[in-house]
């Protein structure tokens, strides 16, 4: 059903594989961001998801993500997975993006359908695609180290097209709200210790387990993934065959666009599903993990973690310190803004499950 090495043409848009090769990116921007709504309401006055909120340096988190990955992937080869009800928040920012690059879900049903739709859409355009998936609303303090790992992972995926690479961040504390990756001991000949097997996933472990994982050198799961489009699709077909065939049936053989009416029915009748839990956890034999080191990564999933990233970024948002404490349910015992030469740091008590930022 794919057309390798061809041009995909639509009104006012031509995707040329000769310019950017077969490297693609997918930004997952369809989430609702409910955990951070107290903060986004404070910043924007509405319930927009955090990826569409200018929380760092006056730019939205989506804009930061686009700027970051443009260092590794041609912007013409970046797809956006969105959700229809969020259109008022992304329409203006993405109005110059061709329709081929925007996948608009009827509503948010989790990461698995969002990823599957984008993979089928991309495979129909370029069967030889190597694709990297990026959350739209995360933070990386050391972007150079992050991008370097992305580049090396693309190189690895090109040589080992049956593998899928996960990017792990060096853990800085026993975080109980993150997913963890326990590396295995298997390496591929010629690649040293940079890309190793995955023994197990640990999703939001209790504190004692998180302390053990930290001591053992396990990594935080950034949910950045790189591999061939064929490898990703095979993983989903093996672990979620019903969903795979259901989505495949909605993709015409002669066009790139999905049947919107079919997709509406599919989304209305399907249950929410999680890619990490339902696909990755059941496919560890195919996975490799690459550490990008202590890059200051945060998922910005809660106000406390956002404030830590704000401090690390050196951004001065005047509404942040006092209002977030009051309106997001944080006490002054949980968060203390330091002054003097350390004013760019924020310190959390252990009860808040965070230590001071680097």
Where are these regions (language model features)?
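Solvent-exposed alpha-helices and their adjacent loops that cap or buttress functional pockets
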Residues: 16-20, 45, 71-73, 124-126, ...
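Conserved N-terminal catalytic core of the sugar/cofactor nucleotidyltransferase
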Residues: 2-30, 35-49, 54-147, 151
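Short coil/turn connectors at secondary-structure junctions
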Residues: 21-24, 75-76, 98-99, 126-129, ...
């Amino acid at each position: 059903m794919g057309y390798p090495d061809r041009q995909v043409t639509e009104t006012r848009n031509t995707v040329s594989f000769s310019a950017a090769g077969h490297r693609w990116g997918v930004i997952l921007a369809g989430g609702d961001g409910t955990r951070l709504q107290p903060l986004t309401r404070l910043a924007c006055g509405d319930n927009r998801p955090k990826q569409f909120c200018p929380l760092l340096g006056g730019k939205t988190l989506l804009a930061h993500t686009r700027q970051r990955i443009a260092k590794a992937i041609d912007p013409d080869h970046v797809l956006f997975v969105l959700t229809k009800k969020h259109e008022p928040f992304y329409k203006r920012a993405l109005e110059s993006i061709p329709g081929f690059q925007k996948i608009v879900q009827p509503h948010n049903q989790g990461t698995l359908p969002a990823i599957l739709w984008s993979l089928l859409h991309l495979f129909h355009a370029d069967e030889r695609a190597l694709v990297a998936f990026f959350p739209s609303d995360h933070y990386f303090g050391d972007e150079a180290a992050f991008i370097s790992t992305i580049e090396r992972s693309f190189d690895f995926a090109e040589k080992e097209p049956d593998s899928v690479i996960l990017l792990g961040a060096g853990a800085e504390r026993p975080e109980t709200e993150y997913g963890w990756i326990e590396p295995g001991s298997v390496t591929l000949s010629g690649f040293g210790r940079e890309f190793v097997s995955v023994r197990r996933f640990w999703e939001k472990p209790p504190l004692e387990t998180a302390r053990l994982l930290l001591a053992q050198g396990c990594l935080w799961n950034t949910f950045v993934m790189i591999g061939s489009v064929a490898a990703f699709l095979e993983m989903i077909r093996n672990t979620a065959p019903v969903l795979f065939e259901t989505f495949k049936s909605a993709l015409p053989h002669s066009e790139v666009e999905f049947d919107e009416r079919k997709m509406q029915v599919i989304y209305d009748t399907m249950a929410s599903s999680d890619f990490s839990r339902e696909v990755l956890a059941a496919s560890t034999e195919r996975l490799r993990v690459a550490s990008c080191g202590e890059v200051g990564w945060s998922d910005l999933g809660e106000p406390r973690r956002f404030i830590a990233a704000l401090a690390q970024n050196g951004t001065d948002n005047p509404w942040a310190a006092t209002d977030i404490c009051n309106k997001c349910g944080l006490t002054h015992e949980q968060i203390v803004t330091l002054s003097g030469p350390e004013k760019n740091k924020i310190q959390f008590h252990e009860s808040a499950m965070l230590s001071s930022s680097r």
